[in-house]
Regions:
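N-terminal secretory signal peptides that target proteins for export/translocation
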Residues: 1-3
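Intrinsic disorder/low-complexity signal
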Residues: 5-7, 22-26
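Sec-dependent N-terminal signal peptides
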Residues: 6-15
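C-terminal motif of bacterial Sec signal peptides marking the signal peptidase cleavage site
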Residues: 17-20
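Surface-exposed, beta-sheet-biased, low-hydrophobicity segments with strongly acidic/polar composition
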Residues: 24-224
């Protein structure tokens, strides 16, 4: 009986020591000030639409391209569609908008860095930023009659050429006319509010790899 009591006492002491050790183990603490990157996928396969994005909240809003459109068969005008609405119709506070592979900003400026990972961009570039520019008959808005050789274009669009470099078009000389690859670069965008964002585009197609215009990107948004 005495031996049994001694064994029980030893077990209790060991249990207390194990509990004490587990309680003394420090809990991991989050790194102060570290910003976690977010990820977003935008279905931009409809040539008629732009998806407007609030990088701070993750909200999106889809609108038809607001400009007038002209459809061509080679150099011959087939039809014209009048402008409808304006960017004032966008209800969210938007930072960037995506149309297929095209990107524009809300009065922002963008620069391409030499880095390929978001967390490697620890300081913002001080030069090289480019604002959006107006382009004519560059943005395709209607491919519904492509098999008849008819393609519709926005008569005027605002695009950010720097951000548009996220995907590289490689002519094939046959059909399909292009193959694509990612630039892999991290882009920095400064907004008129004083906020900024780092973006890296990571995919241009859906999970099957067969449907282009499904745009995925990771980003870090920094408010003013």
């Amino acid at each position: 009986m005495k031996m049994k009591n001694l064994m029980m006492l030893a077990l209790v002491v060991c249990s207390m020591m194990m509990v004490g050790c587990s309680e003394d183990k420090p809990e991991p603490k989050p790194t102060p000030g570290k910003t976690v990157a977010k990820k977003m996928t935008v279905d931009a396969t409809n040539y008629a639409d732009w998806t407007y994005i609030n990088l701070e909240t993750g909200e999106t809003e889809v609108h038809r391209d607001f400009s007038s459109w002209t459809s061509y068969k080679r150099d011959t005008v087939i039809s014209r569609t009048p402008a409808k609405g304006s960017e004032a119709d966008v209800k969210i506070k938007w930072h960037i908008a995506i149309h297929y592979f095209d990107v524009k900003t809300n009065a922002g400026e963008a620069v391409a860095t030499t880095e390929t990972e978001l967390d490697k961009v620890t300081t913002l570039p001080t030069a090289g930023y480019k604002a959006d520019t107006l382009v004519r008959k560059r943005v395709i808005t209607d491919m519904s009659k492509m098999m008849q050789g008819i393609i519709g274009y926005a008569d005027q669009s605002s695009l950010n050429a720097t951000l548009g470099g996220w995907v590289i078009r490689i002519p094939t000389g046959t059909m399909p006319p292009y193959t694509y690859k990612l630039s892999e670069k991290v882009y920095v965008v400064k907004f008129k509010s004083g906020a900024n964002a780092k973006l890296k585009f990571t995919d241009y197609s859906d999970a099957t790899g067969q449907k282009n215009g499904v745009v995925t990107f990771s980003y870090v948004y920094q408010a003013k």
